[in-house]
Swiss-Prot record:
<dbReference type="InterPro" id="IPR035547">
    <property type="entry name" value="Phospholipase_B"/>
</dbReference>
<keyword id="KW-0443">Lipid metabolism</keyword>
<comment type="similarity">
    <text>Belongs to the 'GDSL' lipolytic enzyme family. Phospholipase B1 subfamily.</text>
</comment>
<keyword id="KW-0378">Hydrolase</keyword>
<feature type="transmembrane region" description="Helical">
    <location>
        <begin position="1423"/>
        <end position="1443"/>
    </location>
</feature>
<dbReference type="GO" id="GO:0034478">
    <property type="term" value="P:phosphatidylglycerol catabolic process"/>
</dbReference>
<protein>
    <recommendedName>
        <fullName>Phospholipase B1, membrane-associated</fullName>
        <ecNumber>3.1.1.5</ecNumber>
        <ecNumber>3.1.1.4</ecNumber>
        <ecNumber>3.1.1.3</ecNumber>
    </recommendedName>
</protein>
<dbReference type="Pfam" id="PF00657">
    <property type="entry name" value="Lipase_GDSL"/>
</dbReference>
<dbReference type="GO" id="GO:0050253">
    <property type="term" value="F:retinyl-palmitate esterase activity"/>
</dbReference>
<dbReference type="GO" id="GO:0046340">
    <property type="term" value="P:diacylglycerol catabolic process"/>
</dbReference>
<feature type="repeat" description="1">
    <location>
        <begin position="43"/>
        <end position="351"/>
    </location>
</feature>
<feature type="glycosylation site" description="N-linked (GlcNAc...) asparagine">
    <location>
        <position position="525"/>
    </location>
</feature>
<feature type="compositionally biased region" description="Basic and acidic residues">
    <location>
        <begin position="1469"/>
        <end position="1478"/>
    </location>
</feature>
<dbReference type="GO" id="GO:0016324">
    <property type="term" value="C:apical plasma membrane"/>
</dbReference>
<feature type="active site">
    <location>
        <position position="518"/>
    </location>
</feature>
<keyword id="KW-1003">Cell membrane</keyword>
<feature type="glycosylation site" description="N-linked (GlcNAc...) asparagine">
    <location>
        <position position="1387"/>
    </location>
</feature>
């Protein structure tokens, strides 16, 4: 055997010098081998989807060059060398089919791999022949490399003898398996080197033989060392010799990863330059098989043949130089395909591979110095005795503990010299290196040497921790936290033994940084690397330092946020040795982007950080004056540096793309130094290393290194923001508003904003009534930011001329309050009053330039509403809350120029409840019903408490809905932004689990200054966070660093400068309602009086009317079927589905009495139930409908006519209005009322126990007046409502309106008719919700046609749902106080509820508009009430007319009280006055 002349043994020795151990080439023993032909085993892919499209890649001409060889050109697949992987069917990712007789022989495994590979190629080349694995001739159980020669010769013979193969012309794919099982990478012995040389020469000879003998061949050289080594971890294979004992004193993950990479590179370079790749008909390509990049516990081991075959195939599809050989689970299941651009198998030539020796390896100057400009470099006048008055110049000794980032691995390596990552450049280490000076190398020691040139302990040059150059840098490359205590022990011993220092007297700085390697390995052993074990290891090390080292300031550098490393790894345009990266940190880089494992890792990272802070903040290391540990969070939030093109910038990393280079060490040193000078609690936690920051200097007012004790700012905050400049010129857009542009600050809200009890001392309950407005989080301006943290004090750091803030104490009318117009106890309904006062003050105060000054207004409301919601859940409904808030914001939007409005969530009442009830010794529990009844008094797990939670969520949802409607984003100089930091507030608790009352005022309800400080910081942070990424949690005990604007993002964030699109509202699937009522029980006995009738007493429902009650057109059905009556959806009588999906009166009543009967379902006549309405019915048809209804009731066997209470709803008049113009004389009001009266008389005479709703006819003319051309079928309107043909005729429409009002007026008297009051079991109640019918508008202020059918005439199912809600709510409102307008704003919680105090359906008598029966005077009273009501109706109608007429003209002068959605009309006021007068 000869080597190729151009490759000497010296070339192979390169592999040895790179650290490779002996290579074992294993052949087949020949024993127990299946006969090659007769016992051929056929392996197949089962149920595996083939993703490639071979036809697109086909060529009619066979390739003449191996460098353009396509899979379709291959005729035969073969292999020599045995992979020796034990079979494990089912262990891989793809199922195999094989006969049961197959045994675990090496030959079998080889055939399995080749068969699968052949099956893949068969999709491209159907004529591919059956694969072959050449058997060896040896007889030993473990054969030597010579057997590979036997297999190679046997293979060549078989290929030549194969009659189906054209040996000279057909292309062959040959795989050569070999393995190097020695794991000794760094220090092979002389014997091992000799052994390896001999075997590699043999392997080279085999390749030379194939090159000489086999034309047209593509040879894969496959090293299965890694696969075999992994299998040996699980079981002894019986086919491979055990690895030789490694004589190295130590090996690390880093060294193994680097040497494995070097091994691959050496093969690549050797083969690329060899004769094997110089010709057109032959090529040898090294196919690396490294470990998978996934947690060891998830690996499928041993590997099955199918997986190995896929890995060979996929490697052939990757260009040389880009073959990482690293796969996660998902990738192992994926078959790669040739691309149209590169449809061939990759060789060194067609991959444009550049050998490493040709790559630039010049040593680049990576060091980065800094300018030092601090003027005061003096030490203390005398050596300090306390660590809390320690100046930088007092430091005499420096040391460090940690891992390879502190050891400096690769810090000085040139970009291409990956081997140099193994060099520990300790002199460049960020925290303890001392090479050169600060001008050329930036490190913490070099900064400190500017203060004290005699500093000792820093490391210089390169070397291990055991070398003298390391000095007190005892960091160990590859170290994990469980090795930290050993480092601490070693450091203490070194310091004590050093005769050049005074161990007892010299002040020391020791920096500890550990945890990255724990995180990188944590997914393989979550117990060992749990957050608790991590912090226990930290504690053990710090305990040693605390116990033994005097005069020490310890920097505990927080573990780095490690997941940004994924950005570098996943960026395809960045050239990194990904196999090294994957080995160094498999837990970070081997997980899917949205996997649970990655989420767990991110949480573990945070828990490491959190527990570190908890340990240090516990005070464990603050028991002596001469020792402290301070958390330095410079690495807590680290952004991946990026190039100007936006890709991760590898120039910040060592050649392995994992460790820091000298530039990053320098910038880390500056960040650490800055942290050391920043007060505890106000340290910079986010660093962008792209920007080279200057070296900061000690503050003359505070020249000491910051400790917990000397950083005690109380409730103040340290301003660390550098970008504080205003815009170059005053901005005209709220979306380009900088903090320094704000000139006015204001606030609205309740007692929290007013500042009640902020500074009240514990136990001084009466002082909670004091309004400490100067300390209020959103509006207070007492003292300065260093003493009092509030939003105004933060803004004053940007603009010292800020105005509007409150100071001292006082109520909203005091001069101290200024523009803080919050009022204690204020509810949402009071907000408009505050807004008007605020607007007036801003307009009239000469300190405010109303039109030019930019304003920030903070609004917080809702807590007081929840305190009282249970007293009247209808009044405090979410719908009303929404309306009140909208009305207030509407005024600001209309009246106030240049304003950014912060809408702040209220604190969840559950927090207040927990604090209050779990501290009975400190909180005034006996006064809970007075302080906040509906929050504090419900029992645990009660229905009342569940309702509180439901109302809370509804309020919060209303706020979000209002802001995200875009209603307040129509002007360039105004925006409302929801700041959600209070959405998920964490209860502050003590170590014993009790709520921490130190955050609360003496009443345990209001918040003290400690809590307000956190609110201000959180609000400010929210203002700088983009929409969609705002923090929606608050931990009062957590650290909230002061957020800062940046050069890239200098603006207060709005929807536009956040590039945020309000989410499209999901399609509403149904128009159901949520049922929140608790009072659902019937009367204890069946009532005999209609005036004591509860909803649950109702047994029968019925209805009379026209197309509205038949629900004609409620669902789309096309033009020809427009007249379909959807009775099951009818507002007053439909019973389809359930309340949660279909809001109808019967479905509401079913919640009180599930056995109710009479309702309609579906569309068929026989399912109409007691719905006797007819589509075209008019008033004249009501007597006939009444007779029909009576007959039906009497004939229905399930109805007990005498005993069952019946609810009948009558609505008629729409057709009368639509057709009156055809014969005005026959459509008089008198006739209309007469027919209804006749119908009621029939019911009165025939039916016992009846409650009748008579619904006033809707204001039809107004409803259909301004629809323009938006109707899909306007002709249908004209056909069904001929009077509307004249909608453009003002006189005709006035006549229609007049009749409309007269019909409403006439029917409104029915509630007061004496005839219907004579029976105790009969009542008629007029329900007036349609009296003032307003056209529903959509969010764009256009007509909302979703309330109507396709022809815009009938009501849709949505319209029916809203009618049902309005009717039900009218039934629960006293006569004289009923809502007389429709509110069709969608809300699932608009249904009112009976209460224990008012459980009945309202009649005239139980509305207390009449005296008791015993005192009843003459009938005159019954007529006095309706007369007053009619007069009030006229006033109401005139008001509506005036509003509709004047609104378009006087829109700019419209006041908030003109909004009529939920107003009570004038007739109610008149009736109330009449009652009072009588």
């Amino acid at each position: 055997m000869e080597l190729y002349p151009g490759v000497s043994p010296v070339g192979l020795l390169l592999l040895l010098l790179l650290g490779q151990g002996p290579s074992q080439i294993h052949g087949s023993s020949g024993e127990n081998t299946l006969a090659w032909q007769s016992q051929q085993v056929f392996w197949t892919l089962k149920n595996f989807p083939f993703p490639c499209k071979p036809k697109k890649l086909e060529l009619s001409v066979l390739s003449e060059s191996v460098h353009s060889l396509r899979p379709s050109d291959i005729k035969l697949v073969a292999a020599i060398g045995n992979p020796e992987i034990p079979l494990a069917p089912g262990s891989g990712t793809i199922n195999m089919e094989k006969p049961q007789s197959i045994k675990n022989q090496p030959q079998d495994v080889c055939m399995g791999i080749m068969t699968v590979l052949s099956d893949i190629i068969r999709h491209f080349s159907p004529s591919v022949l059956m694969p072959t694995c050449s058997p060896g001739k040896g007889t030993a159980v473990h054969t030597t490399a010579e057997d590979l020669w036997i297999q190679a010769k046997e293979l060549v013979r078989r290929l030549k003898d194969n009659p189906q193969l054209d040996f000279e012309k057909d292309w062959k794919l040959i795989t050569v398996f070999f393995s190097n099982t020695s794991q000794c990478h760094l220090c092979p012995s002389a014997q091992q080197k000799s052994h390896l040389m001999r075997h590699m020469e043999m392997l080279w000879g085999v390749l030379d033989y194939l090159h000489h003998e086999v034309p047209r061949a593509f040879v894969n050289l496959v090293d299965l060392s890694e696969v075999l080594a992994m299998d040996l971890q699980h079981q002894e294979t019986g086919f491979s010799p055990a690895p030789e004992v490694c004589k190295c004193t130590e090996t690390t993950t880093l060294s193994k990863a680097v040497m494995q990479w070097s091994y691959q590179e050496a093969w690549e370079d050797l083969l690329a330059s060899s004769k094997f790749n110089k010709h057109e008909t032959f090529a040898v390509v090294f196919q690396p098989f490294f470990d998978e990049i996934e947690p060891p516990l998830k690996r499928s081991s041993p590997q099955d043949p199918t997986t190995l075959a896929l890995r060979i195939w996929n490697s052939m599809m990757e260009p040389v130089g880009q073959k990482d050989g690293l796969l996660n689970t998902a990738e192992r299941k994926t078959m790669k395909c040739p691309s149209e651009e590169s449809p061939y198998l990759f060789t060194y030539k067609n991959s444009n591979y550049q050998a490493r020796r040709l790559k630039p390896i010049t040593k680049l100057q990576m060091k980065e110095g800094s300018e030092f400009t601090c003027p005061d470099k003096n030490p203390s006048n005398s050596i300090p005795t306390t660590v809390h008055s320690l100046r930088p110049a007092d430091i005499k000794i420096i040391g460090a503990l940690g891992d390879s980032l502190t050891a400096g691995n690769g810090a000085g390596a040139s970009p291409w010299n990956i081997l140099d990552v193994l060099t520990e450049y300790r002199g460049l280490s960020w925290s303890v290196g001392g090479d050169e000076t600060i001008k050329t190398v930036t490190t913490l020691p070099n900064i400190l040497r500017e203060f004290n040139p005699s500093l000792k302990g820093f490391s210089v040059g390169t070397g291990k921790e055991s070398t003298s150059r390391a000095s007190f840098n005892q960091a160990v490359a590859g170290a994990k936290s469980d090795g930290l205590a050993g480092q601490a022990r070693k450091l203490v011993d070194l310091m004590k033994a050093d005769k050049t220092i005074n161990f007892q007297e010299d002040w020391k700085i020791i920096t500890v940084f550990i945890g990255g390697n724990d995180l990188c390995a944590s997914c393989s052993n979550s117990t060992r690397f749990s957050p608790q074990n991590f912090i226990d290891n930290i504690k053990n090390a710090l305990d040693i330092l605390h116990a033994e080292v005097p005069r020490a300031f310890v920097n505990m550098a927080m573990v780095m946020e490690i997941t940004p490393l994924r950005e570098l790894f996943n960026e395809p345009t960045v050239s990194c040795p990904r196999n090294i990266l994957s080995r160094l940190c498999p837990c970070v880089l081997g997980l899917g982007d949205n996997s649970e494992e990655l989420s767990s890792l991110v949480q573990r990272n945070r828990d490491y950080q959190k527990k570190t802070e908890e340990l240090i903040n516990s005070g464990r290391y603050d028991t002596r004056d001469n020792f402290t540990v301070v958390v330095q969070p410079l690495f807590e939030n680290v952004s991946m540096p990026r190039t100007p093109e936006g890709v991760p910038d590898k120039s910040f990393f060592a050649p392995d793309c994992f460790h820091f280079n000298a530039k990053t060490h320098a910038r880390s040193a500056i960040a650490l130094w800055k942290n050391m000078l920043e007060p505890v609690g106000h340290k910079t936690r986010h660093n962008n290393f792209e920007i080279k920051a200057p070296i900061v200097c000690p503050n003359q007012a505070s020249p000491f290194l910051s400790t917990t004790k000397n950083s005690n700012l109380g409730n103040g905050t340290w301003m660390v923001c550098e970008e504080r400049a205003p815009s170059a010129s005053p901005p005209t857009s709220v979306h380009t508003l900088r903090p320094a542009d704000i000139q006015v600050v204001a606030a609205l809200g309740d007692s929290l904003t007013a500042g009640n009890g902020i500074s009240s001392q514990e136990g001084n309950l009466t002082d909670v009534s004091t309004q400490y407005r100067g300390l209020s989080y959103s509006a207070g301006g007492d003292k300065t930011l260093e003493n009092v943290t509030t939003l105004p004090n933060i803004l004053r750091k940007f603009n010292g001329n800020l105005t509007g803030y409150s100071v001292g104490t006082g109520d909203s009318s005091s001069a101290n309050a200024f523009l803080n117009q919050a009022v204690p106890g204020a509810k949402a309904e009071n907000l408009t009053s505050q807004v008007r006062t605020l607007v007036q003050k801003m307009k009239s105060d000469n300190r405010v330039n109303f039109n030019r000054d930019w304003k920030v207004i903070t609004v917080m409301i809702g807590a007081s509403d929840l305190c009282d919601f249970c007293t009247d859940s209808n009044h405090y409904s979410a719908a009303n809350f929404f309306d009140h808030l909208q009305n207030a914001l509407d005024i600001l939007h209309k009246e106030v120029p240049r304003a950014l409005v912060n809408l702040v969530d209220f604190i969840n009442p559950s927090i207040i409840r927990e604090v209050f009830l779990k501290n009975p010794d400190k909180c005034p529990v006996n006064q809970s019903s007075v302080l906040c009844n509906c929050v504090l008094t419900p029992r645990k797990d009660s229905y009342e408490l569940a309702r509180l939670e439901a109302f809370t969520k509804s309020y919060q949802s209303s706020m979000l809905q209002l802001v995200e409607s875009g209603r307040y984003d129509t002007r360039e100089d105004f925006s409302v932004v929801l700041q959600p930091f209070l959405l998920n507030t964490k209860l502050p608790v003590l170590e014993n689990g009790k709520p921490d009352t130190s955050f609360f005022a003496p009443d345990c309800i209001h918040l003290n200054q400690k809590f307000h400080t956190q609110l201000a910081r959180a609000l400010w942070a929210n203002m700088l966070e983009p929409l969609g990424k705002k923090t929606d949690t608050l931990d009062p005990k957590g650290h909230i660093s002061l957020a800062c604007p940046t050069k890239d993002q200098p603006f207060l964030r709005t929807f536009r400068n956040s590039n945020y699109k309000y989410p499209t509202k999901p399609a509403i699937e149904n128009w159901g309602s949520d049922f929140l009522c608790t009072e659902k029980s019937p009367s204890s006995q069946v009532p005999t009086s209609v005036h004591e009738l509860r909803p649950a007493d109702i047994k029968v429902v019925a209805a009379m009317g026209d197309f509205l009650t038949t629900a004609t057109g409620a669902r789309p059905s096309g033009y020809k079927r427009l007249a379909t009556p959807w009775r099951g959806l009818s507002w007053s009588i439909g019973g389809d589905g359930k309340l949660e999906t279909h809001t109808t009166l019967p479905n509401i009543l079913k919640k009180f009495n599930p056995s109710i009967t009479g309702f309609s379902t579906g569309t068929l006549d026989n399912k109409a139930g007691l719905n006797v309405a007819e589509e075209g019915a008019r008033a004249q048809d009501m007597p006939a409908q009444a007779k029909t209804l009576v007959k039906k009731m009497k004939s229905t066997p399930t109805i007990n006519l005498q005993e069952d209470w019946k609810l009948i709803t009558l609505l008629i008049g729409n057709n009368d209005l639509c057709l009156y113009c055809e014969n005005p004389e026959d459509n008089s009001t008198k006739e209309y009322v007469k027919y209804i009266q006749q119908a009621l008389d029939i019911l009165y005479e025939e039916l016992p126990r009846v409650f009748i709703n008579v619904v006033e006819v809707m204001e039809l003319a107004g409803l259909h007046h301004v629809q323009g051309g938006k109707c899909a079928m306007p002709l249908a309107v004209q056909k069904n409502c001929s009077c509307l043909r004249h909608s453009q005729n003002l006189t005709a429409m006035q006549e229609l309106k007049k009749l409309n009002w007269n019909l409403q007026s006439g029917i409104s008297e029915l509630s007061y008719w004496h005839r219907y009051m004579e029976r105790e079991d009969f009542a008629v109640t007029v329900q007036p919700f349609f009296r003032n019918t307003f056209i529903p508008l959509n969010e764009r202020e256009g007509l909302d046609l979703t309330f109507f059918s396709e022809d815009c005439f009938y009501f849709s199912d949505r319209g029916h749902a809203e009618m049902a809600i309005a009717l039900w709510n009218n039934m629960l409102e006293p006569v004289g106080w009923k809502t007389s307008s429709n509110n069709f704003i969608y809300n699932r919680t608009k249904l009112k509820c009976p209460s224990p105090e008012r459980p009945f359906l309202y009649t005239l008598r139980n509305s207390q508009l009449l005296p008791d029966k015993a005192e009843e005077p003459s009938n005159a009273l019954y007529w006095a009430v309706p007369v007053a009501a009619i007069g009030g109706l006229a006033v109401g109608i005139l008001g509506v007319m005036l509003w509709r007429t004047v609104k378009p003209v006087q829109q700019e002068e419209e006041e908030e009280d003109t909004l009529p959605n939920t107003s009570v009309t004038q007739d109610a006021v008149s009736e109330k006055r009449l009652k009072a007068g009588n």
